[in-house]
């Protein structure tokens, strides 16, 4: 009986160890999990993945911070602007996909993303309908720039004088965000109908969408999950001067493909920035007990490099690192994008304004992604809207102002997975961990039986060393 147990333990130990090593080397269970995820992460009507894509369950908030101008007269005399940050004014962002249509072969799906904003008073510093902000007159600057390029110059000069337009204006937060009717724009609209009579930093963005997208469903390849192939009927942009800069790359930022490697560079197309951007791995994170890869927008995105030369408008007219001229896609308004407080921009932009305090924690854009599922656990998209201003001798409204990139406001669009969704995701991840750890469980059993085998071997040797008195007696006695 003892000898039988001895051989059984040894055989089981060897068999289990060989099996576990074979399973680990062949990655049998890991491949099974990966294939299951790849198969399920497809945009198919009626699935959980599709429902989450159509109506994202995670709460999204957008915070607006304005820069109130405290020394307007001094600025017109050539002094440095002194700005005071006012905010946040927080809104809940409600989003859903609509007008959904699948392609004939199931590999594509078209949709628009509707967005609406609901004010959150308890997360804000004041009432946007009451609070006043003094800021630079972007409609005036837009019209002045228009006058440089058209035959309407004399007419525009006359209108500015007649209506006594000022370079700095006061409006409520609500007006600056969602729009108001501007006197000068209304007059220009009569002669140039493509110029809207209304102005707002997010005018016609509440309760609307940014156009139709065509996405890949991931049916043919999981790496293509929710990847954009068309936007507003175009497979590429036409604003920039090179084919590379005009490419529409990646997803819309709401989702990413599963099974992400930290060595990957991920791409996304935020239409409000008028270009595609890439994000790179930064660190390992833990969000609500879930593992995550933190990806960040690198400084090179807005760097003054040869790779970004195609974003210089007009061609060859490149600005210093940290800012992007997007006036070409904003109906000619002299809008310059940057990170908040000119974070990661050239020092010249920071020092030109009193009140800029860039720091990583508050002004960096990032996204924390669960690498197994590609689900976003936490994220913050932060960028600043500025305008380009300079002295123009023919327009007295500009006074003796310095040439500069003038901050208007910045936003922080953030998302954080809720506990209920996190617990559901934990259940999925824990199940996959159990499956992928089966080889280690088998190995542990092999080690256990190996120890039993060793113990039985030692016990058997001890039994041979210790016998009865008769067994130890010599066979031949004298």
UniProtKB/Swiss-Prot annotation:
* Result for mutant: residue 160 to D: Abolishes interaction with GBA1. No effect on normal location in lysosomes
Effect annotated for changing residue 191 to D: Abolishes interaction with GBA1. No effect on normal location in lysosomes
Q: How does it sit in the membrane?
A: Multi-pass membrane protein
Provide the family line: Belongs to the CD36 family.
Which molecular function terms from Gene Ontology are attached?
cargo receptor activity; cholesterol binding; enzyme binding; phosphatidylcholine binding; phosphatidylserine binding; protein homodimerization activity; protein-folding chaperone binding; scavenger receptor activity
| A GO cellular component annotation in the UniProt record | lysosomal membrane
Q: Which residues cross the membrane?
A: 5-27, 434-459
Q: Which residues lie on this side of the membrane: Cytoplasmic?
A: 1-4, 460-478
Q: What is the effect of changing residue 68 to Q?
A: Loss of glycosylation site. Causes retention in the endoplasmic reticulum and abolishes normal location in lysosomes
Give tissue specificity per the record: Detected in the extracts of brain, heart, lung, liver and kidney.
Glycosylation sites (chain numbering): 45, 68, 105, 122, 206, 224, 249, 304, 325, 412, 430
Q: What is this protein called?
A: Lysosome membrane protein 2
Under the heading InterPro entries, the entry gives: CD36_fam, LimpII
GO annotation, biological process? aminophospholipid transport; endosome to plasma membrane protein transport; protein targeting to lysosome; receptor-mediated endocytosis; regulation of carbohydrate catabolic process; regulation of glucosylceramidase activity; sensory perception of sound
């Amino acid at each position: 009986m003892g000898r039988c147990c001895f051989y059984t333990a040894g055989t089981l130990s060897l068999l289990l160890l060989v099996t576990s090593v074979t399973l680990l080397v062949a990655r049998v269970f890991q491949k099974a999990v990966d294939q299951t995820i790849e198969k399920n992460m497809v945009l198919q009507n009626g699935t959980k993945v599709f429902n989450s894509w159509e109506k994202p369950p995670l709460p999204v908030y957008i915070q607006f911070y304005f820069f109130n101008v405290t020394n307007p007269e001094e600025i017109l005399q050539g002094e440095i602007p002194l700005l005071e940050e006012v905010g946040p004014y927080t809104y809940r962002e409600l989003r859903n996909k609509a007008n959904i249509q699948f392609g004939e072969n199931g590999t594509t799906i078209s949709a628009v993303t509707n967005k609406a904003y609901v004010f959150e008073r308890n997360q804000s510093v004041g009432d946007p309908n009451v609070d006043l902000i003094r800021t630079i007159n972007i409609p005036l600057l837009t019209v002045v720039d228009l006058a440089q390029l058209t035959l309407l110059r004399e007419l525009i000069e006359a209108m500015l004088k007649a209506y006594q337009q000022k370079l700095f204006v006061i409006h409520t937060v609500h007006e600056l965000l969602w729009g108001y009717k501007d006197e000068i724009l209304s007059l220009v609209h009569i002669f140039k109908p493509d110029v809207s009579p209304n102005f707002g930093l997010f005018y016609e963005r509440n309760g609307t969408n940014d156009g139709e997208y065509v996405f890949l469903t991931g049916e043919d390849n999981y790496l293509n999950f929710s990847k954009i192939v068309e936007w507003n009927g175009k497979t590429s942009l036409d604003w920039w001067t090179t084919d590379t800069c005009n490419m529409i790359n990646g997803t819309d930022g709401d989702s990413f493909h599963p099974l992400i490697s930290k060595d990957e560079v991920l791409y996304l197309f935020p239409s409000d920035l008028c270009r595609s951007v890439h994000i790179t791995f930064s660190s390992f994170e833990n969000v609500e007990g879930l593992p995550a890869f933190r990806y960040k927008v690198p400084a090179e995105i807005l760097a003054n490099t040869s790779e970004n030369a195609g974003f210089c408008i007009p061609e060859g007219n490149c600005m210093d690192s940290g800012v992007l001229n997007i006036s070409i896609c904003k109906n000619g308004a002299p809008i310059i994008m940057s990170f908040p407080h000119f974070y990661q921009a050239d020092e010249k932009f920071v020092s030109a304004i009193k009140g800029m305090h860039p720091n990583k924690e508050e002004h960096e854009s990032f996204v924390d992604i669960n690498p197994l599922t590609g689900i976003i656990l936490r994220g913050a998209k932060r960028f600043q809207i500025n305008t380009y201003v300079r002295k123009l001798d023919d327009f007295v409204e500009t006074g003796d102002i310095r040439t500069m990139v003038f901050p208007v406001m910045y936003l922080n669009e953030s998302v954080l997975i809720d506990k209920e969704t996190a617990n559901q995701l934990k259940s999925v991840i824990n199940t996959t961990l159990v499956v992928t750890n089966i080889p280690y469980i088998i190995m542990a059993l092999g080690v256990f039986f190996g120890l039993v085998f060793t113990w039985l071997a030692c016990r058997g040797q001890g039994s041979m060393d210790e016998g009865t008195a008769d067994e130890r007696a010599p066979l031949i006695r004298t």
